[in-house]
Amino acid sequence: LVTVPRQNGGLPMPSEALLDVRDLRAGYGETEVLRGVDLTIAPGEIVAVLGSNGVGKSTLNRALSGIVRARAGAIKFEGHDVAHEKPQAIVARGLIHVPEGRRVFPNLSVRENLDLGSYRRGAASRTQNRERVFKIFPRLRERSTQRAGTLSGGEQQMLAIGRGLMAEPKLMIMDEPSLGLSPILVEELFALIERINADGVSILLVEQNVVQSLELADRAYILAEGKFVMSGSAKDIGANPELKRAYLGM
């Protein structure tokens, strides 16, 4: 892993990290997809993971959220190693995965979809969290009784993120949130992600939209063939044309 020097300090120390991943290995069957991944996220950070299709981004998300079991390595969240915990236990700790493709329940209403994100919470907490989501996404309030399957792609993405917020996350993993959206909607969505972060939620943004991600993120990692090959401040990575050309196809 090559680290691009930062002008304003280095990577978070493990003791300061909200998420600290060390030598993570994961895969499917006999295929090892992640081949020794190290990653840190400090409280309040937006960290981007960039890379082309097929390099292991989705596997990383699934391993961090417990959907794919780690074969080796540590995933420490607030100091607790969650590498072998079940997804429900990881959610209860406040690590929430918003998957690629939105995955809303099309025949349920917007409100019912949101409430599924807070199934572990009491009624009072559910109401409070729903109001918080509606303040961030006013369109969801307007469509609260509408079936999720009738929403536009952008509205479904807002619903998927809102459902994640219902679980009171400390860290949200967002897997390709801009996929399939128009440039105008992408700008709107990234502004809303920035607002969520300003409210105290750390963000792991896994994206192919390199330009928008580097503008939003504090730091970035570049994933290639199951390993991080570069990390540093988003500003420094964005200013390196050779790096972007070699690993990001820009």
Where in the sequence are the language-model features?
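ABC-type ATPase nucleotide-binding domains, specifically the catalytic core motifs of the NBD
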Residues: 29, 47, 85, 110-128, ...
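Conserved ABC transporter NBD signature motif
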Residues: 73-81, 93, 126-130, 232
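The feature captures the beta-strand-to-loop junction immediately N-terminal to the Walker
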Residues: 50-52
